């Protein structure tokens, strides 16, 4: 029996290099290692192609399509870049397409308006949302939609040891990019209000953002960057 060919397409900025891997790359790494098809999976990143300075996303996905257009691909996973869908659908019409949303769909090119989201619903085999909130945002103002191929799959962790509630500390963590797409502005707003109610709690942010626009008061949120590099 022929092995399945499964391609996972990372966003242009994401890398499989452990020194520069982002949230999407880490998610893909953590999930594929448990897949029974892991030997059939090929992960695509911009490192597979020559980089350009303009129209980077467009050239990245077009280069992928041109390179593999004569390859029989069974399943293609697109992560967090709905704008890639039209190209994939054109070049690989027989492939099953899954689209993963890691962020608010209304902030991503290719899913910002109602028509774009209707196109996604009609041209994918599965749509996977990494939180219920992300799913709710996708269906904002959409009516009479079929949810058969829609999955909400919240990101979880492996609980390695039990936690004694009597020993818990008053720390609340935010882990991720420090931007609005990740809800960091909401976290900071809540922290500022809650600290006035009970200043004994600590709000800690782990992450960074190259184009930072949110600057919380140091009295409300402590930003500590990244603690360590996750190795592949």
State where each predicted segment sits:
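N-terminal strand-loop element at the rim of the active site
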Residues: 3, 8-72, 82, 209
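Short His-centered aromatic/hydrophobic patch
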Residues: 78-84, 101
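A short, histidine- and acid-enriched strand-loop-helix "catalytic/donor-clamping" loop
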Residues: 95-112
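Nucleotide-activated donor-binding/catalytic signature segment of Leloir-type glycosyltransferases, i.e.
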Residues: 212-230
């Amino acid at each position: 029996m022929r092995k399945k060919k499964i391609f996972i397409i990372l966003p242009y900025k994401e890398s499989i290099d452990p020194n520069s891997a982002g949230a999407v790359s880490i998610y893909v790494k953590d999930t594929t290692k448990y897949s029974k098809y892991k030997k059939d999976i090929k992960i695509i990143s911009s490192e597979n192609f020559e980089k350009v300075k303009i129209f980077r996303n467009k050239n990245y996905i077009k280069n992928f399509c041109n390179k593999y257009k004569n390859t029989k691909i069974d399943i293609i996973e697109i992560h967090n870049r709905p704008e890639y869908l039209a190209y994939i659908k054109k070049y690989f019409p027989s492939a099953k397409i899954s689209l993963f949303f890691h962020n608010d769909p209304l902030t991503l090119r290719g899913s910002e308006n109602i028509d774009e989201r209707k196109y996604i619903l009609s041209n994918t085999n599965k749509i996977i949302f990494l939180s219920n909130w992300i799913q709710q945002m996708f269906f904002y103002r959409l009516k009479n939609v079929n949810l058969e191929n829609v999955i909400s799959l919240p990101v979880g962790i492996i609980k390695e040891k039990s936690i004694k509630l009597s020993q818990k500390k008053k720390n609340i963590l935010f882990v991720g990019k420090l931007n609005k797409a990740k809800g960091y502005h909401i976290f900071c707003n809540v922290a500022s209000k809650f600290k006035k109610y009970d200043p004994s709690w600590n709000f800690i942010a782990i992450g960074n953002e190259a184009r930072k626009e949110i600057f919380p008061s140091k009295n409300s949120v402590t930003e500590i960057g990244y603690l360590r590099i996750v190795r592949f």
